Structures are given as C-alpha cells and as structure tokens.
Amino acid sequence: TLAAEFGKHPAVQLWHLSNEYSGDCFCPLCQQAFRDWLRVRYGSLEALNHAWWSHFWSHTITDWSQIDPRDSSVDGMRLDWLRFVTHQTVDFMRAEIAALREGG
C-alpha cells in the first residue's frame, strides 16, 4: 500500500487523509453516541440543564432519552451537537492516522 511504501519516508511531511466531510447523521447510533458524550461531558442532567439554561425556555431535560439533536430550539444542545460532530471527526482522523503509521 501507499502507507507501507511512503508512510515513514523522510520527505513526506503531510498526508491527505480524506475530504468532503459534511452533513449530520441522526441515526439511532449517532443519537445515542451524542447522549453518551453528553453524560461524560456534564455528568448529570442537572449540570446539563444548567449549562444549556434549558429551564429558562421550559425545555428542562428529565431523562437522557429526551435529548434529540435534531431539535434546534435549544441553543446549548445545538452547540454541543456541533462540538460532538467535531469530536467524532477528529476521532475518525486519528484512527486513519494510526492506520497509516502502522502501515508505514
């Protein structure tokens, strides 16, 4: 493969991993991954509601299953969704980098 042949070549400074990342996936797996990410980030629904200021807009979350990233009416959720998508993209790129380094 290209990685095996050129992965550790001293003249290679950069490697274009992939491109054209776009669009949001709201499948059940991605929605659950988002909820899990939020649990790690906030630790509790109380902390999440405080951070999102959800009580002000009468959007208080009482169960993790109520979190639906397709709902753009809660600004804090939309911002965290964008953070989550960025985290997932970076995680994907790190996996590609690791594969290239192993093959190189």
Regions found by a protein language model. Give the residues of each.
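Polysaccharide-binding and catalytic clefts of secreted carbohydrate-active enzymes
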Residues: 1-104
